[in-house]
A protein has these predicted regions:
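Secondary-structure junction motif
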Residues: 94-115, 178-186, 196
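Central regulatory/effector-binding core of bacterial HTH transcription factors
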Residues: 1-56, 124-127
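A late-sequence structural motif
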Residues: 9, 158-196
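Hydrophobic hinge/microswitch elements
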Residues: 32-37, 41-45, 51, 101-155
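Flexible hinge/capping segments at coil-to-helix
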Residues: 59-70, 74-96, 180
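Residues at or immediately flanking beta-strands
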Residues: 23-27, 118-122, 167-169
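Short beta-strand->loop
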Residues: 61-71, 142-146, 153-168
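Alpha-helical segments flanking ligand/cofactor-binding loops in enzyme cores
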Residues: 37-38, 63, 89, 132-133, ...
Length: 196
């Protein structure tokens, strides 16, 4: 699983899968998109849940699971808390918490440059729990996928102008036969009521 995927939604799917398919053992590990691709190609993984940002090419079979918007998250007393949605230009000069493992980071930073939006990262981390804790501690705001926000204390507003979204997909290697458990997982993922 890509490390930026919201675990709550995925856990609901995995719980239903476990109820429907007793006896199937699951192992979940986190990695970057590149590492997941490598492990799939080498046969170390049967399936990967990831964002095929620029496509995975013919080397992979991809089943889209759901799409999610990027939101701006901040502490409840933040000056932007009264807004229903946030434009990128609203964030210029705001203290920022940088999600280093975000696969969409370059895209968002490019949109900032195009609009002359200046962000100063006061804190950087690859860990989603640290990012949310620092935002809650009022270090700054963060951009996050809407289903990855797990702290109920944080406020979140959709990012507009530009709106940014990602697709979360299930990837496998075409031509490689599925084990019965893997085939069951693929069928279950295709019929699950995502995002969960």
């Amino acid at each position: 699983v890509m490390s930026t995927i919201g675990h709550v939604k995925l856990a609901r799917f995995l719980a239903k899968f476990q109820r429907d398919y007793h006896g199937v053992e699951l192992e979940v590990s986190e990695a970057s998109v590149q590492e997941l691709k490598n492990r799939l190609e080498q046969g170390d993984l049967d399936l990967a849940v990831l964002n095929p940002l620029e496509g995975l090419g013919a080397a992979f079979r991809v089943h889209d699971l759901y799409s999610e918007r990027y939101v701006v998250v901040f502490a409840p007393d933040h000056r932007l808390a009264t807004l229903n949605a946030i434009k990128l230009v609203d964030l210029s000069q705001e203290p920022y918490v940088d999600r280093l493992s975000c696969e969409m980071r370059d895209l968002v930073m490019g949109a900032c440059r195009e609009r002359n939006v200046s962000l100063y990262a006061r804190f950087r981390s690859e860990r989603e729990d640290w990012i949310q804790s620092m935002v809650l501690a009022r270090i700054g705001f963060a951009f996050m996928p809407e289903y990855s926000v797990t702290s109920p204390e944080l406020l979140q507003r959709p990012l507009i102008e530009p709106a940014v979204a990602r697709t979360v997909s299930l990837a496998s290697v075409p031509g490689r036969p599925y084990s019965p458990a893997t085939a069951a997982m693929v069928r279950a993922a295709q019929t699950f009521d995502w995002p969960g």
